[in-house]
Structure formats: C-alpha cells, structure tokens
C-alpha cells in the first residue's frame, strides 16, 4: 500500500501568465511544512523518484504538492523555454503558499531534472527554506563543456540532491566540484530515470532527507 494511501490528494487549478497550471496536493493532518516539486521536460508526474519522494515525505508529515507546468496541462509534448517555466512556477508556488488555503511553511522547493533547474533559479524569489533536487541535469548528454553550474549555485541553503550513478546528464562525480557547500549529494544506482529496482535505495535516500529537512 502506498505511504499516502490514507491521505486525500486534492487537485488545485492555478493561474499563471503562461496559461493554467495545476497542483496535486497531499496534506497530512499535522504538517511539518510544505515541499513543492516540479516535473521534468518529459512531463512525467509519476516518475519513480517523484513518487517515492512524495510518499516518503507525506509519511514523514510533510505536505507535498507536485506541480504541473501549463505546457503539460495544455497537452503539449514539448516543454517551454526556461524563462516561461520560471514565469509559471513562481506564481503557482506563491498561490499555494498564500491566501485562505495557504500551505504551511517552511517551504522546500525542488523537482526532477528541468523541474530541479526551475526550483534553483527561483528559490530566492520564493524565499525557500530548503531544496530537493532529483536528477539535476548539470549538462546535456555528451556536452560536459556546457555546464549549468550557475543554476546549481542558486540552490537554497540547505539542499539535497539525489543523483544516479550513471546519469548521462551528470554523475555525482561530475557534480561534486560544483555542489554548493550547503548541499549534499546522495548517490543512487541508476541513470537519469531510475529503474523500478532502485525503489528501495530511493526510499532510503528520501527517508534520510526527510529526517534532516528543517521543519
């Protein structure tokens, strides 16, 4: 049975300058805070690492919101450019954290792949208290000369990264020189998308992170 089987998932429609977005919110009765996660450019909301992160964090008492970018809600197959992703993400997270139905702080921002990049670029604007980056894409496959280390440097303090040992977008070894001193990398056997067999290792990684998150 899923760790969130007893928690109702509520879907919230969210307005953005880039079109309608959506959030899938799981909120336990007594919440330690909120983790908002974004999906990757492939658009998978049910990737293994996102699913495990949600389940483990909710079981540990965190409210978790998995946010759909407008391009995915609209049924498009190609993700928007980084500026449009940021322009949609910021008001969606702000809406979740404000108003009569606001989710509780502290706020942890993150996501997988492209979603992790968005979370880093916008963390300061959203006054995030911590970060959770899954499969951070340091570079395109075969292009280690074009790094996204400047984005990684914007990750909030503290931040945790869960990275596949064979990720063609950047292995833990490749990440090491660029990881901020306030961030920790947890290695999990796998590539950019984790196989089902990585489930136990991902659960262990997320359990460790859940215990360390500020809240």
Label every model-predicted segment.
Residues 106-111, 134:
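Short beta-strand immediately N-terminal to the catalytic nucleophile in serine-hydrolase-like folds
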Residues 65, 180-193:
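Catalytic histidine neighborhood in serine/cysteine hydrolases
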Residues 165-169, 192-194:
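Acidic catalytic loop of the alpha/beta-hydrolase fold
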């Amino acid at each position: 049975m899923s760790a969130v089987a007893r928690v109702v998932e509520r879907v919230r429609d969210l307005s953005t300058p880039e079109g309608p977005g959506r959030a899938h919110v799981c909120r336990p009765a007594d919440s330690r805070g909120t983790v908002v996660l974004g999906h990757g450019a492939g658009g998978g909301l049910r990737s293994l690492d996102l699913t495990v992160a949600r389940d483990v964090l909710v079981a540990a008492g965190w409210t978790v919101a998995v946010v759909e970018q407008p391009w995915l809600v609209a049924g498009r197959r190609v993700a928007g450019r980084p500026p449009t992703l940021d322009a949609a993400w910021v008001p969606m997270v702000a809406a979740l954290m404000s108003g009569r139905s606001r989710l509780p702080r502290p706020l942890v921002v993150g996501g997988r792949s492209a979603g992790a990049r968005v979370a880093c670029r916008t963390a300061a604007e959203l006054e995030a208290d911590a970060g959770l980056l899954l499969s951070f894409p340091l570079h395109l496959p075969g292009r280690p000369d074009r790094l996204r280390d400047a984005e990684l440097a914007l990750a909030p303090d503290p931040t945790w990264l869960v990275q596949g040992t064979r990720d063609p977008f950047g292995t833990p070894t490749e990440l090491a020189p660029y990881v901020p001193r306030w961030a920790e990398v947890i290695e999990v056997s796998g590539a950019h998308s984790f196989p089902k067999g990585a489930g136990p290792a991902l659960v262990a990684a997320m359990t460790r992170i859940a215990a360390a998150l500020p809240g």
